[in-house]
């Protein structure tokens, strides 16, 4: 059964200010809710198992609490406002009006109803939800949430972040499949994008496909002006609500991908686009048919329903191709774009064949492009992941038909694998100005060629990933301006987190394998021969790189010219990955 979807919350400044005051007073934070739940229940909830959390807060939903909130039988903390708010807005429980009134003294129950975040509960359904079997019954003084209102915590170099993010109620709270227009809260992909986005002071930031607005909120801490776009009017309503609740200024525009910002350039573009590859026929649909580019009339029988937060209404991975082909024109000189995405691998292609084809034009224009594949699934695994995400399990009668639809779609393009990862683009200050920006450019030097780097990395080390990737982009730019003679004349240092790992057969003197292992960043492991390992080990800034290579060759009787020619590209790679520093 699919959940009904209520109207989006209303943007009423006075009531939002009262709600904010109540949330602050209640200490409705991630840390506080985890204290209330305990380690076991909090951990289970992160795995999307709400049962331990419901047990921990069960006294709040006891029938005795409806007529007499003082009768709540449990620890004092369970009767506190943070517990009430969490049970109501995250677990989807029906709670006594009196308890809610105590938790929201400034806003009040009526104010919460006017905002569109609460409604009277009707008993008979799960957790007091409307029951078609008893439509005339009344709740006896209980209310339920119309939105998920979750605390959010993060930290950047400007300090601790504590926000609240409103979105549509999750499947966990409603017990029903998601509505096609569902607006997602802060999911795993949102957290990933927030972790990899550079956090540096900039002028203009664009969030493409903003959803409930979390990336725009993060960007506001470093930008003078943030613009967030989405095709979904409902998503923009939630984003506006969240910006106002958290006292953040964001300009919101409705439209598909980059259409709302035609002719404009930005210093930073972030996007968690609806990249999920879903059976949608063989060609892109006209976006005028509906918010996801499809309509009920042109959806084939057995074709999965579209969810606007994940489905872009395009065939295969063409939405990502479309977005990446258009992005460069919107990057100002020195500007960076960071996004997540999926790409298909067909037939005997290399995993990066599609990203390379999409980014060839950007590279030719002088941009630096970096694709990092973090995960890969076969077609069956991918289908299972996203059918489950839509609320269908293997026990559901629709499961075989849905899986078959995905596999048939992949077979039509001979897809053998699907990758997930990061795409980063940077327009160097010296690269040719974009068409949109050319009227403001005095004519920059576009002679420096662009670069295109792809790698598969699955690890994560210590440190801040956003800073690590930003440093890598700067190093790509720096090295592109440095010839081999300049590099050889540089004094390099090995990174403090770098170690060498040697594999030896028992009793052998010489290693069968040498690896350079990174402790920070993406925790890369790079195979090395004796010459590279010896060179890296000696790079402490005392000698130049060229002198160090010459010394290693003298000790090993290796040919200096051949060794240098072989090692310099490897050293460049180690500089980009942060294993070496200039």
Residue ranges and their predicted role:
Residues 63-79, 123-141, 284-303, 431-456, ...:
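Intrinsically disordered, low-complexity terminal tails and inter-domain linkers enriched
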Residues 81-146, 211, 524-582:
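Long, charge-rich, low-complexity alpha-helical segments
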Residues 231-232, 315-372:
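Conserved Class I SAM-dependent methyltransferase catalytic core
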Residues 179, 187-271, 277:
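Conserved SAM/SAH cofactor-binding pocket of Class I
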Residues 379-438, 445-483:
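Flexible, glycine-/basic-rich loop-and-beta segments that form/coincide
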Residues 273-322:
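Mobile active-site "lid"/loop adjacent to the S-adenosyl-L-methionine
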Residues 121-130, 136-205, 210-218, 222:
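SAM-dependent Rossmann-like transferase core, predominantly class I methyltransferases
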Residues 2-68, 77-83, 143, 173, ...:
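Acidic, low-complexity/disordered tracts enriched in E/D and polar residues
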